[in-house]
Amino acid sequence: MAELGLNEHHQNEYINYMRFARSKRGLRLKTVDSCFQDLKESRLVEETFTIDEVSEVLNGLQAVVHSEVESELINTAYTNVLLLRQLLAQAEKWYLKLQTDISELENRELLEQVAEFEKAEITSSNKKPILDITKPKLAPLNEGGTAELLNKEILRLQEENEKLKSRLKTIEIQATSALDEKSKLEKALQDLQLDQGNQKDFIKAQDLSNLENTVAALKSEFQKTLNDKTENQKSLEENLATAKHDLLRVQEQLHMAEKELEKKFQQTAAYRNMKEILTKKNDQIKDLRKRLAQYEPED
């Protein structure tokens, strides 16, 4: 429908709703006609009427017609609200915020275009049938599948980002535990050496020799343990660096996806919404980088 700027699928949706509205309008007009017909058959049986009788008949007819018209207007408004709710609900599933221009609802030019299209749709003898199929949920901005693929890629990157956060947290816990263990071993060695110095004047030479041998053995064992802990710490630091590189890669991919979306969504109402989502994700990544910097080894 070139005159209203809709594609074939949305044209079919529009025609279905237009037919529904026309059917409801026809039923209500028949109801109004029946009000007049009932009046003719039930009240207009006399040849002459007084002014009071005519006023009474017209007042009764006015009340009935007023009630019917009011009911139809209310029902039409509620129907439009339900239709709008469907569109908004589908948009929210794609993290979009739709905007409406109420002033366009009174645009005479557009209203005339709608009327002309309805007239052409009614009178056209070669119009294509509208297939009644099960309709999938709307996929906004799905031009050639590019935007949908970008959205899927963003979701994948978000999942990978969460996995990296979890992995980073585990590495941080392991690194903290290793540092604590190393500190405990160093303190135990210092305490043992201090205790050895305090007891040298109170033991015999033989006992001192044995104690020194024992201390040497313990020191060697402690040193070996410390070396193992140091190697473990280096491994944890390497894992931490790897996690940081992975995080930077994810950030770069998110940045590339953002640029691609900007090219795709520019000049659309959804551009600002997707930009806001990517900005939040970048802020989360910046916060994560700050947290990573706190656990990087100092020179």
Curated annotation (Swiss-Prot):
Sequence segments annotated as region (Interaction with BSS9): 145-299
GO terms under biological process: negative regulation of protein localization to cilium
Disulfide-bonded cysteines: none
Family matches, as InterPro entries: LZTFL1
Keyword Cytoplasm in record: yes
GO CC list: cytoplasm
Coiled-coil region(s): 88-296
Keyword list, A-Z: Coiled coil, Cytoplasm
Localization terms from the record: Cytoplasm
Lineage top rank: taxon: Eukaryota
Presence of the UniProt keyword Coiled coil in the record: yes
Function: Regulates ciliary localization of the BBSome complex. Together with the BBSome complex, controls SMO ciliary trafficking and contributes to the sonic hedgehog (SHH) pathway regulation. May play a role in neurite outgrowth. May have tumor suppressor function.
Subunit architecture: Self-associates. Interacts with BBS9; the interaction mediates the association of LZTL1 with the BBsome complex and regulates BBSome ciliary trafficking.
Family per similarity comment: Belongs to the LZTFL1 family.
Protein's UniProt name: Leucine zipper transcription factor-like protein 1
Species annotation: Macaca fascicularis (Crab-eating macaque)
